[in-house]
Amino acid sequence: MKNELSKQIISTVRQFVNQDVAPVVNELEDKDIYPKELADKMAELGLFGINIPEEYGGLGLSFKTLSDIFIELSKGWMSLAGILGTHTILSYLILNHGTEQQRKKYLPGLANGLYRGGLGLTESHSGSDVQNIKTVAKKNDEGYEINGSKMFITNGSNGNLFVIVSKTNLNATPKYKGISCFIVEKVDEGFSVGQKLNKLGYRGVDTCELLLQDCEIPLNRLLGTEEGKGFTQVMDGL
């Protein structure tokens, strides 16, 4: 049954690329236009919920199916695969490392495209050196206050939900044990989108700076139940 569904979806994606993507891809890439209509169609096709279990509103299909979908999308336009790929990392992190409350709250919306987003990991000064990020989350009586910035974030301006990687223990040894992940919504006070980056290629999909200035989030937005698990969570998601 799942195999048949996978075949049908891959065939549908191939048709979508030929009929909807091919006629507009050159203009969208050249003018760096976010493909909202195409992304909305991807949501209608169920692509944002490919690996999310059915109990949370997804299709519950395999990563093999997802990789085949990436191939078909990339044949038409790599940027569409980028939109889906980053979104899928976000979904994976919440599914595999979030609490049941977090899964029930966010996964149905991630599956149907109500929530779209990505991973706030990279910073301008540290690149992929995760242990040396400078974004800090300080715990208080009501939750966490996050300060810092993220760079090169896919889906940065058009996303509305992100996992933000932050330091929670500046004195941890080794450093990676002082890193935690947090679920941040675009509407959270203190969260904003900075500059959109101009790229030579891989255009259309937005790549942006994210700014967190005294960003207040509740305690239950810590991904999972324990601080200090962020590094291993992110490595698993990637």
PLM-predicted stretches and their roles:
Residues 147-193:
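A short core secondary-structure module
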